[in-house]
Amino acid sequence: MPRKRPANAPRVLHRSARVALRATPAQARRLWQLLVSGGDVWACVLELNALRRSRGDAPLVGYQALCRELARAGPGTFGELDSAGARSVLRRYSDAWFAAAKARRAGDDTARFPRRRRRLVPLRWYAGTFSVEGRSLRIPTAARRPPLEVRLAREVPYPPDRIRSVTLVAEAGRLYLDVCAEVPLAAHGPGQGPDPSLMAGVDLGVIHPFAVAGPGGEGLVVSGRAMRAESRLHLADSRARRRAVARRAPSKGQRGSRRWRRFRARTRRIEARHRRRLSQARHEAAKTVVTWAVDKRVGRLVVGDPVGTLEGDAGRRHSQRLRDWRPGAWKACLFDKAEAAGIEVVFVDERGSSSTCPNCRQRVPKPSGRRFSCPHCGLAGHRDLVGAVNIAARHEGGGDIVSMPETITHRRGGRHLPGAGRSRRDPRRIRWDSHRARRGSWPAVARPPEEPPEGSSSSVGALPLEDPPTAA
């Protein structure tokens, strides 16, 4: 169980990092078997409560009561799974049951109690039951079984004494370790920490994930075009792969065949890689904003909450853009990094922030481009920065008034993505551009000159053709 902290202890934050495992085939088989044993514990609890329900008894859902039943089973009941890992499954079941009961009492009829079997269940070990030394992890096993030592793909980014728990998870056919640690708040020197009187407005967007209007006429714009290109190229690449394997893909009657399993595994790997790339790009963009705010000594970030944008029904294409945008993930990344830096984050309604002039407070037609121009007072500037200024003005907690930025810093999010740099080339873009050229769309490939008919004096067909333009 997690330890209890004294009331007067310094404040800490809980952060997690996912580390891949470099296990041998024998170690991988033991790790997968541990996850299967966790699923067996989950199934036993379901069967136990089903039996009690048939007898008319109350369900057994308390964590301590479930642990007593586990102790009666004895060691070695679930293979190599030790009691600490099995108790983590019981904790997961108990939390899920009480969460569903709470939602039911609140009037949510769609909340369901745990009822389905799960083949693989994540296992968690708390501090004191495992050991991490460099890139080596030692996991406990059942009595009279050799412990499991696994090599990590990289060193854990936290000191060993700060690690509170490790969780063994499986995603897209790969094994990972989620490490949770206690991280202290960032320490700043005298006169260098965040100033609560300095405030900045943050506007969330699709083209530009973050547009920040700070004090002193400073502004920051983080571009997300590389992330949008990653989503578009991933979609085009997935469609191209499906077309390529359509002829050799297994039919519906061959479900479970070797070819079917390989096809599904390849799809899961591609989807998981796409999600990892976008997740890292979101964290990099949020880190850019927080680093900029720390340099400017901003103590409060007023973030526009686009909840109104998600409620409307604007059609299938707009809903798809919003799903790809994922504003909740952007807000979570920004909040976590700002909290670790000691910066307060406040969410306000952003409705109408990009169509209101921050100078004369008049509503204007929302510009279709990136340029905002007020027909009443003549104010002009970046549309997203105008929204950030209006968002900062909606906070009622005090602070300096944020004006229209005069010095704008531009940063690009997702610089690690394939094809984001000038000297790098995404192989998917080459395949996608050639497909577009075959359809006849831009950029078009120049056709070879036609031979003039015999006896004709025209020399148009002999003119040299320029090289076709290349997509950036």
Where are these regions (language model features)?
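Long, hydrophobic, amphipathic alpha-helical segments used as structural scaffolds
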Residues: 46-53, 97, 101-108, 183
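Acidic carboxylate diad motif detector
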Residues: 62-171, 324
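Well-ordered beta-strand positions in beta-sheet-rich domains
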Residues: 18-20, 149, 165, 199
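Positively charged, helix-rich recognition surfaces that bind polyanionic ligands
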Residues: 6, 15-18, 29, 171-472
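Gly/serine-rich nucleotide phosphate-binding loop at the start of the catalytic core
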Residues: 1-86, 466, 471
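Stable alpha-helical structural segments in soluble proteins, enriched in small hydrophobic residues
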Residues: 45, 89-100, 385-395
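Short amphipathic alpha-helical coiled-coil/interface segments
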Residues: 38, 89-97, 267-274, 331
